Regions:
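ASCE P-loop NTPase helicase motor core
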Residues: 74-77, 82-256
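C-terminal accessory regions
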Residues: 247, 355-359, 366-483
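Conserved SAM-binding loop
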Residues: 69, 116, 169, 297, ...
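Interdomain "pre-motor" coupling segment immediately N-terminal to P-loop NTPase/helicase cores
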Residues: 1-53
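Conserved helicase motor core of P-loop NTPases
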Residues: 75, 192, 200-363, 373, ...
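Long, charged amphipathic helices and adjacent flexible linkers at domain junctions
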Residues: 47-63, 325-332, 465-480
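Conserved pre-motif I regulatory segment
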Residues: 56-85
Length: 483
C-alpha cells in the first residue's frame, strides 16, 4: 500500500473508479484510454458528408468486378459511405476481403484519398496483395521514431501534422494495442473516415488493452459482423475446421486425399518432432510441391520437448545443417547460420535497412521474420533480409533474434502461410485455449496439418477461457464514463 501511495504521489499511476471497481492505471495507459474514448466519441458525434450516389456506384462496382454482394457485405460497403467510424468483423471464408475491396473501390470512385495499413509487415503485405493497393504498417504510416535518450516513441504524424487521407482502413485490428490505437486516432484529421477490420475471435493484442473487443462490445460503433461462409470457402476443410473450433467443437480428424486439412496422431514427443521434420524436409516439398520456405510450424509454447526451442533445433539441423560453405556465428545457446530463418523478438528502432531501389530507413519490429543472407568472415556483421528490406546486424544484436522455423501462435498473429503445421501437445493451462487453436488454424492458406494428440485438441476447442484484460474503455464508451 505504501508503494502504491508513493507511485500515486509521483504521478506514475492514476486511480479511478471504473464500472464500480477501483481501477489503478499506469499514467500512460490511463491517458491513452481516455484519449481513445474522447476521439471515438467525437467521431460518433460527427456526421460525415454522405457520399451521394453511393448505392449506384456500388451497383457499378459489382458489375465491374463481376460479383454480387451478399446482404451483409453490401451493408458494410453502404455503411462505409455513411459512417465516420465503422467496424467490419468476420471469420475465414465470410467475405471480409471482398467487402474491403468494395469499400476501397467506393471511396476511390468518390474521390477520397484512401490509406491501407495493418499492425505487422506481413499483415500489411497480405492486405496490399488482396486489395491491389499498397498497404503499410501502422508504424510506418505514422512515421514512428524512437528517442534514444528518453526512450520515448514518437510519431511524425499526429494532431499537428495529420495524415493526408480522407479514409484509413486497418486490417487485423485485434492486434492493435491501446498505445498504437491512440497514436492512429491522433493522426486522423477531422472528418477522416476509419474502417477497422478484424476477427475478434483471434488472440488479443500483445500490448495493453483490448481495443477492438471493447469497441465492438460497447455497441456504440456501427458494426457489421459477417457470419455466412461462402459456398466456395465452405469446400475448404481449413475454413470448416476454424468455424467448428470457434463453436467449441473438435474439427473432423478423418483424412481424405483431396483435403487441405490433415491430422497425424502422435503421442510420443520424439516421434512427433521427427514427423514435423520429415514433413518440412521431404514430404511436403516432394509430394505436394510446397517448398520448406513456405511452411510454418506453429506451437502453443516455447518450452518442453515439443516447444519452439526444441523444434527449431531439429528443423535447423534438417533444413540448414552446418557445412556446405555456410558461415555461422554462435550466440548463447544458438548457432546462427547463413540461410537460417530468424525472427526479431523485440522492437529495435535503430536497426538500419535498405531496399533494392535504394530507399532506406530504420526499425525492425517484434515478430518480423527474415533470412540470414551473409555473415562476414569476422562474424561481426550479419546481413538479414526481411521481405524487401535488408538490415545489417552487429554480433551483439543477435540477442534480439531467435530461430523462426517454428514459432508460437502468438508470434504468428497477423501472418498467413501457404502451409501450416500445428503441433498439438500438452502445454501450460493458459495456452490450452480455443483462441490459440483458432488462430493457428486461420494462419493456413492452402494446407493445414495438425500433428499430435486429439486429447489436447479437444481440450483447446472446449476451453473458451480468454486472457482477462482490465480495461475501462467499454465502460467509458457505453456508460458515459468520464473521458
Amino acid at each position: 500500500e505504501k508503494a502504491l501511495d508513493d507511485l500515486l504521489e509521483r504521478g506514475s499511476v492514476v486511480q479511478e473508479q471504473v464500472a464500480n471497481v477501483e481501477g489503478c492505471y499506469l499514467r500512460r495507459c490511463h491517458e491513452a484510454e481516455t484519449y481513445v474514448c474522447t476521439r471515438v466519441r467525437a467521431m460518433l458525434a460527427d456526421k460525415p458528408d454522405k457520399l451521394r450516389g453511393a448505392k449506384k456506384i456500388i451497383d457499378e462496382i459489382e458489375r465491374a468486378q463481376g460479383i454480387e454482394y451478399a446482404p451483409l457485405q453490401r451493408q458494410a460497403v453502404e455503411l462505409a459511405a455513411q459512417e465516420e467510424l465503422l467496424i467490419l468483423t468476420g471469420g475465414p471464408g465470410t467475405g471480409k476481403t471482398t467487402s474491403v475491396r468494395g469499400i476501397v473501390a467506393l471511396f476511390e470512385r468518390m474521390g477520397l484519398d484512401v490509406l491501407l495499413c495493418a499492425p505487422t509487415g506481413r499483415a500489411a503485405k497480405r492486405m496490399g496483395e488482396l486489395c491491389g493497393k499498397e498497404a503499410q504498417t501502422i508504424h510506418r504510416l505514422l512515421g514512428m521514431s524512437w528517442n534514444e535518450q528518453t526512450g520515448d516513441v514518437t510519431f511524425t504524424k499526429n494532431e499537428k501534422e495529420p495524415l493526408e487521407a480522407d479514409a484509413v482502413i486497418v486490417d487485423e485490428t485485434s492486434m492493435v494495442d491501446l498505445a498504437l490505437m491512440r497514436a492512429l486516432l491522433a493522426a486522423l484529421r477531422p472528418g477522416c473516415r476509419l474502417v477497422l477490420v478484424g476477427d475478434p475471435d483471434q488472440l488479443p493484442s500483445v500490448g495493453a488493452g483490448n481495443v477492438f473487443g471493447d469497441l465492438i462490445r460497447s455497441e456504440r460503433v456501427a458494426t457489421v459482423a459477417l457470419k455466412d461462409i461462402f459456398r466456395q470457402a465452405e469446400q475448404s476443410a481449413i475454413v470448416r475446421s476454424a468455424h467448428l473450433v470457434n463453436e467449441g467443437r473438435l474439427p473432423e480428424l478423418q483424412n481424405t486425399a483431396a483435403s487441405d486439412f490433415f491430422f497425424l496422431p502422435r503421442r510420443d514427443s520424439v516421434r512427433l518432432v521427427d514427423t514435423v521434420v520429415e514433413l518440412c524436409r521431404t514430404r511436403l516439398p516432394e509430394k505436394m510441391h510446397i517448398p520448406a520456405e513456405s511452411i510454418q510450424v506453429l506451437t502453443a509454447t516455447r518450452k518442453g520437448d515439443t516447444g519452439t526451442a526444441a523444434l527449431n533445433r531439429a528443423l535447423q539441423a534438417a533444413l540448414n545443417p552446418a557445412g556446405a560453405g555456410r558461415r555461422e556465428k554462435r550466440f548463447g545457446d544458438l548457432v546462427f547460420r547463413e540461410g537460417d530463418r530468424v525472427m526479431q523478438t523485440r522492437n529495435d528502432y535503430d536497426v538500419l535497412w535498405e531496399r533494392e531501389d535504394g530507399t532506406a530507413g530504420a526499425g525492425i519490429f517484434n515478430g518480423d521474420v527474415g533470412k540470414i543472407l551473409q555473415i562476414d568472415p569476422s562474424g561481426e556483421l550479419i546481413s538479414i533480409a526481411f521481405d524487401d528490406r535488408v538490415a545489417t546486424y552487429t554480433a551483439d544484436m543477435l540477442a534480439e533474434l531467435d530461430m523462426a522455423y517454428a514459432m508460437t501462435v502468438h508470434k504468428a498473429q497477423g501472418s498467413e502461410y501457404r502451409a501450416v503445421i500445428f503441433v498439438s501437445a500438452p502445454a501450460a493451462p493458459g495456452l490450452m485455449v480455443r483462441g490459440v487453436l483458432y488462430t493457428a488454424i486461420t494462419r493456413a492458406r492452402e494446407l493445414l496439418i495438425l500433428v499430435g494428440d486429439d486429447v489436447s485438441l479437444g481440450k483447446m476447442a472446449a476451453n473458451d477461457r480468454r486472457t482477462r484484460r482490465y480495461s475501462g474503455l467499454r465502460w467509458r464508451l457505453g456508460n458515459g464514463g468520464t473521458a
